[in-house]
Regions:
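Class I S-adenosyl-L-methionine-dependent methyltransferase catalytic core
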Residues: 1-211
């Protein structure tokens, strides 16, 4: 939490707008802002709302250059569960996939595209009880005229309970855990915006390019 805010302060960007429905992390963001601005000759402009993205006042936002988000995966990322104001979290408010998609996920993306030139969304298809929900495809289908492509983002392995790594006798198998943690995990970042070639610098050239 707070990594995107930290990245903003480390960059040349001048303004940052964000939101978080968790009052605890919201307070920590205010502390981050205060501490980071102490190191700068000119404080940066930052505004964060204590609400979910579905309640963000988009009409009050200026034109945005770049929006980056990783919406809580349906029925997977249950942030602040059991905490203060958990009822404001998307997993609590949108507890069925169709409702999550139609009232939260896609409308938030649509509102974002109205104010932002580029939108980058980190999301994977959640698999619940053996059923894969194709969140990525649904996002691309919704904004296919603005779809620019996707990049892979390497991530740390998500923590899991030790019981997942028990052997046949039910005993914890550290070697099994180490093997799992040493694997490389990649998640998609879906890219949207006006037509442009964002990936030309990383594309491998071939002789065909000369003809």
């Amino acid at each position: 939490w707070g990594d995107r805010l930290a990245g903003f302060f480390a960059s040349n960007a001048e303004e940052y707008y964000g939101c978080d429905p968790n009052p605890n992390t919201y307070r920590r963001y205010q502390e981050q802002i205060s501490q980071y601005n102490k190191f700068l000759a000119k404080p940066k402009k930052v505004q964060i709302w204590n609400c979910g993205a579905e309640d963000l006042p988009y009409d009050k936002l200026p034109p945005i250059d770049c929006a980056f988000t990783s919406p809580p995966y349906f029925s997977t990322e249950e942030y602040n569960k059991g905490g203060e104001l958990e009822e404001n979290q998307s997993w609590f408010k949108f507890n069925e996939y169709d409702k999550w998609r139609d009232d939260f996920y896609l409308p938030v993306a649509e509102n974002t595209m109205k104010v932002s030139k580029y939108m980058f969304v980190n999301i994977m298809d959640p698999k619940i009880h053996g059923v894969r929900y194709r969140s990525g495809d649904e996002l691309v289908d919704k904004f296919k005229d603005k779809f620019l492509g996707q990049v892979g983002m390497r991530i740390m392995q998500r923590p899991q309970g030790k019981a997942v790594f028990n052997d046949e006798d039910g005993k914890f198998d550290k070697a099994k855990l180490d093997e799992h943690m040493n694997k490389m995990f990649i998640e998609n970042v879906w890219c949207f915006g006006p037509e442009s070639d964002l990936f030309k610098n990383s594309r491998v050239a071939t002789l065909d390019d000369f003809f």
